[in-house]
């Protein structure tokens, strides 16, 4: 670590840690950020902007949950282009415009249980499907736009998205077609780095079981997870996917992120392209090469949060919510829409037992305790496995005999200990493992038999609600 910057990184780490609770108040809560491709009658990316008025006037006919049925939605507008609607916020759930005009994000939670999450999520999804149906459109349980390629024309007209396209080029435009299934799980301050490391280490487990994007731009790719595979060797691939090694602590986390280029800088409400290493931004813009005990200049921490927001590793800590965000899953098939959320929560709840198993199974003999960061000896094998499962899914050789079954069993036991019966939601994953076929492998077979229209037909959410 750069000696002149160490105190700066340490100070930023202290401020970052303060956004997480000293201890959790009861069982972990879970939230969900689920992205869905929406396609028009021809199967091409629709324009989400046409859905807002239909969602606003749509009547909620879903059953009330404990959190209440649909409350009125409030329009959220872009800070720069105030004519642009970027989302609709309600008490139980919200909708948000995504990078691509044809992708919409559903946000639900935090919820006390997966069943509470499922109830609110289903209400939001039913309302979305009804609105899309009025235009003859389809909402897909799939991880990418199946027919429309990533283009600048598909980019949502948020000012910051244009700035990111200017600096990242094709790597940013890729996000105009992708659709992930993410979860937010609350974590305490003391465990934050350990959970972050573990969440990244589990990326290949999630991809193996939940990849669902082999068909992109109407063509069959070589990957079960096309949305992950595209970024492995991309120019900005270091910002995406599984990290190269575990972080020793939060100071190390800040230091590692600071060695990446800052993509944006703030000028009033606008975000403009940047490009310098964030460590240089700290030094040149904030005089951040401080001596011990010197206070950071105003705006330094906000600049770090802006930088951190545009790094998309498989797991990342979110100061706004005090959570770990888990990101590797593609959007799931419409008949198994809770599978990834259940897996995410089970992994976090079972972290200690799963980590102990992984270390025993994968760490080279005699190396388990040599590194200051737990599980670092397992990292190279899991990184290799990550690349294999992106390509081959559950056909990839496991890093140890029965590896996935053991991890899934430990996640299941962890959910069972919560006492809500949530472990039932892992049933689709057990079926996938038994068949050795994840959704991406299944979609590959559908495409080979029925083409891209067959893929859209089996991914159509309306058929399963």
What are these regions (language model features)?
Residues 36, 183, 326:
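Conserved, mostly hydrophobic/aromatic
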Residues 287-300, 314-356:
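Long, repeat-rich segments with strong aromatic
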Residues 1-172, 177, 211, 322, ...:
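Terminal catalytic/cofactor-binding subdomain
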Residues 140-319:
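Loop-rich catalytic cores of soluble enzymes, especially ATP-dependent carboxylate-amine ligases
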Residues 39, 109, 186-188, 329:
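Solvent-exposed residues in well-ordered beta-strands and their adjoining turns
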């Amino acid at each position: 670590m750069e000696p002149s910057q160490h105190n700066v990184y340490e100070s930023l780490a202290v401020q970052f840690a303060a956004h997480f609770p000293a201890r959790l108040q009861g069982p972990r809560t879970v939230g969900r950020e689920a992205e869905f491709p929406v396609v028009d009658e021809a199967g091409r990316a629709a324009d989400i902007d046409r859905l807002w008025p239909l969602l606003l006037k749509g009547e909620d006919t879903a059953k009330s949950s404990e959190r209440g049925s649909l409350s009125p939605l409030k329009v959220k507008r872009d800070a720069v282009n105030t004519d642009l609607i970027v989302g609709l916020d309600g008490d139980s759930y919200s909708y948000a415009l995504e990078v691509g005009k044809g992708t919409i994000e559903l946000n639900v939670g935090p919820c006390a249980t997966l069943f509470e999450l499922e109830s609110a999520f289903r209400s939001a999804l039913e309302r979305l499907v009804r609105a899309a149906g009025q235009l003859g459109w389809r909402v897909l349980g799939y991880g990418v736009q199946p027919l429309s390629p990533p283009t600048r024309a598909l980019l949502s007209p948020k000012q910051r998205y244009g700035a990111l396209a200017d600096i990242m080029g094709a790597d940013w435009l890729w996000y105009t077609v992708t659709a992930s299934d993410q979860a937010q799980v609350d974590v305490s301050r003391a465990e934050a780095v350990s959970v972050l490391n573990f969440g990244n280490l589990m990326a290949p487990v999630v991809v193996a079981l939940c990849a669902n994007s082999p068909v992109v731009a109407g063509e069959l790719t070589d990957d079960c997870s096309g949305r992950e595979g595209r970024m492995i060797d991309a120019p900005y691939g270091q910002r995406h996917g599984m990290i190269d090694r575990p972080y020793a602590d939060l100071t190390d986390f800040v230091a590692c992120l600071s060695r990446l280029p800052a993509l944006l800088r703030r000028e009033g409400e606008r975000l403009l392209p940047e490009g310098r290493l964030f460590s240089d931004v700290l030094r040149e813009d904030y005089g951040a090469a401080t001596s011990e005990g010197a206070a950071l200049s105003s705006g330094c921490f906000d600049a770090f949060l802006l930088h951190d927001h545009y790094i998309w590793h498989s797991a990342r800590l979110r100061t706004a919510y005090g959570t770990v965000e888990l990101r590797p899953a593609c959007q799931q098939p419409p008949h198994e829409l809770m599978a990834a959320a259940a897996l995410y929560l089970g992994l976090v709840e079972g972290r200690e037992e799963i980590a102990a198993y992984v270390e025993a199974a994968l760490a080279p003999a005699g190396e388990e305790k040599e590194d200051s960061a737990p599980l670092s000896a397992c990292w190279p094998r899991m990184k290799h496995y990550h690349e294999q499962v992106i390509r081959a899914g559950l056909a990839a050789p496991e890093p140890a005999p029965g590896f996935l079954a053991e991890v899934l069993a430990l996640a299941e036991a962890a959910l069972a200990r919560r006492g809500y019966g949530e472990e039932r939601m892992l049933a689709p994953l057990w079926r996938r493992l038994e068949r050795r076929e994840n959704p991406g492998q299944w979609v590959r077979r559908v495409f080979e038999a029925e083409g891209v229209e067959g893929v859209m037909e089996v991914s159509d959410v309306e058929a399963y609600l």
